[in-house]
């Protein structure tokens, strides 16, 4: 594990770069910053880009990728682009529609990975979070196995090279894996995963099923007031993490990132700062000793920054199993 260009095999024979660049945008950041950050990331060796229909920045990310293809920095096949099916498109007949919207926005012919963003379905329409007159989210009952069959058809049509899931618990993954007539297993489960929520059980489960665990909020969170409790702990200020970082003469962010790579997790990072983006590529220049990995394991407190409270009361809420 010595290079940002390294890829690991997925269970369908495709390969995913071991380090990804996330494209969610906090409210305070202008969308054109996404174009700039994506180009900087490509120039610094990033090839794996994670986005979603929900993020409303796919046009900008696509523009940045295409400009770096046009100037000869990369070829399309060098880039691994992930997008996500939003909850208002879970009906089987709507799955391809959502993916086609992504392809139109990015102006790409296919996505490398298409994943179900959440296991919870919402009523279809143009609004991301449809609500009734009392402000209650309008849930929809769609069998996740039916949604998965439509995802399989997107892969067969060549619109998505690989398909996976996000924010699923083990029980929900089992439903798909045990589905009669299953054609393709999910290649990944993308979940919140960091030192305070190390997802050791989910990681063991995914490894046992040949499913890659992809982590978001890898370095904690951006403290975005729209979804993060401002009283929540600041991960990168953790004294144990900072002491280990000092020992290796690295930043706490690099140690938190290296921890995930050594566990076999594919971490996503996000930054709009050119210096920070370049710094994070140095994660391949050192290795953590086993005693330090154990010390970092000990920081787990099963703490979520993203508790998906907006989906509270949904019968398929994944975190109610915990």
Swiss-Prot record:
Active site, renumbered: 55 (proton donor)
Q: Which residues carry this modification: Blocked amino end (Met)?
A: 1
Q: What keyword terms does UniProt attach to this protein?
A: Cytoplasm, NAD, NADP, Oxidoreductase
Q: Where is this site: Lowers pKa of active site Tyr?
A: 84
Task: Please state the Enzyme Commission number of this protein.
Answer: 1.1.1.50
Tissue specificity comment: In brain, highest levels found in olfactory bulb. Moderate levels present in cerebellum, cerebral cortex, hypothalamus and pituitary. Low levels present in amygdala, brain stem, caudate putamen, cingulate cortex, hippocampus, midbrain, and thalamus.
As recorded in UniProt, coiled-coil segments are none
Pfam families named among the record's database cross-references: Aldo_ket_red
One GO molecular-function annotation for this sequence? bile acid binding
Query: Cellular component per GO?
Result: cytosol
Assembly, in brief, is: Monomer.
Its protein name is: 3-alpha-hydroxysteroid dehydrogenase
Primary gene name: Akr1c9
